[in-house]
């Protein structure tokens, strides 16, 4: 099954879902990093030990870690990259299912597409790279080399 779709001047690259147990562990730790420090702070206050500055630092640090783990879990579940082509520019955006990353915009002039191998050599996987000579869009979705070549051929044949 291909990991890409070309429609309406957009290429959508989809992430293969990671195994269920890995996603379950990621979601559990993301949830735990948000709730356990807060629950510990509430328990400390309820037991009469008061609120210490360390609790606030702990909640802050673990909330950042929890947010990062949630983002990784969402990427491994719903992740896709959207590359929108227009006459003058190319807009790249990573979609996490519940949120989206900041858009990266490059000029659509003297564009070259190529695949960069990634991972183990025997896996024969890589990532798609778009380069206009000044700026680069480097996709994060690992795809089989054959599918990347198909995406490159489709993008070169379509005049956006």
What are the language-model segments listed below?
Residues 17-19, 75, 89-145:
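Non-transmembrane, membrane-adjacent beta-strand/coil modules in membrane-associated proteins
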Residues 3, 80-82:
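Short, surface-exposed charged micro-motifs
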Residues 16-80:
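Alpha-helical transmembrane spans
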Residues 74-80, 87, 147-151:
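Cytosolic juxtamembrane helix at the C-terminal end of the final transmembrane segment
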Residues 1-7, 153, 157-160:
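Low-complexity, intrinsically disordered extramembrane tails and loops of integral membrane proteins
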Residues 10, 82, 88-89:
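Structural motif
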Residues 23-36, 53, 95-104, 138-153:
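Extended intrinsically disordered, low-complexity coil regions enriched in Ser, Thr, Gly, Ala
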Residues 1-19:
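Cytosolic juxtamembrane N-terminal segments of multi-pass membrane proteins
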